[in-house]
């Protein structure tokens, strides 16, 4: 990407002028951002992401960050000599793995993100779904995609029962940027590991967000030939599920994105987190990036 310092002043002014209509349009609106993939592990992309989030806040939007941490969890499990297992894109989470998930997400990844936002000039507060009773969950009953009579036991993986967004709204009103780890709690105060894409999608719905933006390690949703699909409807997504084009970790991502679109989130985007400032390009310019999910 071109170094901003090398751009001529007139071109910089034109870029800012192009962003102005979007800044006006989205002023005061909530943007839920799922932060994951390479954008979380590359230092330059980490700094870019933090700067982008702070900029959105400074121009009057309300960014809410929900983060993943799969690679970091996998590294921690490897150090313990424990092998990670996935079923239909969900991490199998026994009691020991749940302890690792909580420690890595809330104690390591979340705090790194909060620190980066502070370095970029913003104010962030880290939360888990336990804080403020935000995310109530129950054990996920996972039915096999190909044989509905088969149910997989994925341990302490959670299915969201309800989200209370009051703590998030309070932080937004006080000029903070919420950074949320996808951990919920059950009736017996047990912890649940919840897919971050699902949390972001449900939270966007509850907050009546203007946009849900999911950062990934791909240009967006790809067909079987590797071509980018820029616009997908519910019917098209069902067909991609059926023929196996969408599989693995993309399953919960696309399902959650579609649920959010059906529930009234105005725009749902799956974009390439490996592209510097891709989030700003999606939100503040007329240049479309990645895949847009529509309910119809």
Swiss-Prot record:
GO molecular function: acetylglutamate kinase activity; ATP binding
Name the record gives this protein: Acetylglutamate kinase
Sequence similarity: Belongs to the acetylglutamate kinase family. ArgB subfamily.
Binding site for substrate: 69-70, 91, 193
Single GO cellular component term: cytoplasm
CDD domains per record: AAK_NAGK-C
InterPro entries noted in UniProt: AceGlu_kinase-like_sf, AcgluKinase_fam, ArgB, Asp/Glu/Uridylate_kinase, Glu/AcGlu_kinase, NAGK-C
Reaction equations catalysed: N-acetyl-L-glutamate + ATP = N-acetyl-L-glutamyl 5-phosphate + ADP
């Amino acid at each position: 990407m071109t170094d901003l310092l090398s751009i001529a002043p007139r071109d910089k002014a034109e870029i800012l002028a192009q962003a102005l209509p979007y800044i006006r349009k989205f002023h005061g609106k909530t943007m839920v951002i799922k932060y994951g993939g390479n954008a979380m592990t590359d230092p330059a992309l980490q700094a870019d992401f933090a700067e982008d989030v702070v900029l959105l806040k400074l121009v009057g939007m309300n960014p809410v960050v929900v983060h993943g941490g799969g690679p970091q969890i996998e590294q921690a499990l490897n150090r313990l000599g424990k092998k990670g297992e996935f079923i239909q894109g969900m991490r199998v989470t026994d009691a020991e793995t749940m302890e690792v998930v909580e420690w890595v997400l809330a104690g390591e990844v979340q705090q790194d993100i909060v620190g980066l936002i502070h370095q970029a000039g913003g104010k962030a507060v880290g939360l888990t779904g336990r804080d403020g009773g935000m995310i109530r969950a129950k054990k996920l009953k996972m039915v096999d995609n190909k044989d509905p009579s088969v149910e997989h036991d994925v341990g302490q993986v959670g299915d969201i029962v309800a989200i209370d967004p009051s703590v998030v709204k309070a932080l937004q009103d006080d000029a903070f940027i919420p950074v949320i780890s996808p951990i919920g709690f059950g009736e017996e105060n047990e912890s649940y590991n919840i897919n971050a894409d699902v949390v972001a999608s449900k939270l966007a719905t509850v907050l009546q967000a203007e946009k849900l933006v999911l950062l990934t390690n791909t240009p967006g949703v790809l067909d079987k030939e590797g071509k980018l699909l820029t616009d997908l409807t519910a019917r098209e997504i069902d067909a991609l599920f059926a023929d196996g084009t969408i599989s693995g970790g993309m399953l919960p991502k696309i399902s959650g994105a579609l649920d959010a679109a059906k529930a009234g989130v105005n725009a749902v985007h799956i974009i390439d987190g490996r592209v510097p400032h891709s989030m700003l390009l999606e939100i503040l310019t007329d240049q479309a990036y990645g895949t847009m999910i529509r309910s119809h």
